[in-house]
Structure formats: C-alpha cells, structure tokens
Amino acid sequence: MDWQDLLAELEAEAEALADRQREALAADLARDERRHVGISQRLAACIASAVSVQLASGEALTGQVDAVGSDWVLISDHHREHVVLLSHVHSIKGLSAQAKVISTSRIVAFMNAHWLLVRICQQRSQVSLRLVSGELCTARIEKVGADHLDLSNHQTVLVSAIVAITRI
C-alpha cells in the first residue's frame, strides 16, 4: 500500500468516525430536548385535532383540542366545552409526537387553572364540576379561593379535587 492509499484510508475512517459522532450528538440533543417537553406543549401541537382523554374520575372525554394553558386543556365535543385539569389526566389517545410552545407571551403563560377559574366565576356561568371521586357538582362558581371554590349550592370544593369543568 502506498502512502496516498494509506492517507485516503485514514481520511475515510476519520470521516466515518466524525459522521458517527455527529449522529450520536444529534440523537443526544433530540433526547435532551424531549426530556424538557411537557404534556401541555404536546397538546398545543394538537390544536383543532381530536383526542381522547382518560380522566382520574374513570371517565373519558373525546373531542377537539381548542386551547391549552400551562395546566389545563379546553376540549370541545359536539355539545359542550370541557376544561380539563392536566393534573388529573391519566392518559391521552391521539396525541401528536410533535410539541409546540403554548405561547411566547408571559401573559398567556400566566393563564393557569386558577386564572381560568376566576374568569369562569366572573362570567357567572352554570357549570358542572367532575370531581376525582366521580361526583358531579352542578352550580355557579361564586368565589375562588387560593385552593377552593365556593359554589352557588352552598358547597365548597377543593380545586385539587376538580378533574374537569363543563359549561352547561
């Protein structure tokens, strides 16, 4: 083997090694990026798509994703709109493998479930609250506390017990 062939062979081996290292780095970066993707970002990529959400109460809601917040998702079916608190979602079918930033706006990032409950209270809408226990409470939200809601039926419900809110 002459020197030219040896150098060419070494160069080819170096290129192959560099290619493998770039591929490994790209795979590591992709895994690292996925590690930081939350369920709300995956749901944001599903806006206007159908999903089926299995709730902690044992029920499933199927419908179109209309909006997503940091800890909630708005799903509409043919008849109603449901705000589902993500902390009580067990699984989701139809979820995109893609992810999307909910919003770059600090204001939108601030719109968590508590913010949403305050807005629902201000609207004085009649709602049905699905609780973790499976119970349904139908009333208007009269007051929103730090961790609870006072309802028009003189019942107080802990926010941590709410699985979904459906406008009636």
List PLM regions with ranges.
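Short glycine-rich, low-complexity segments
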Residues: 1-62, 66-168
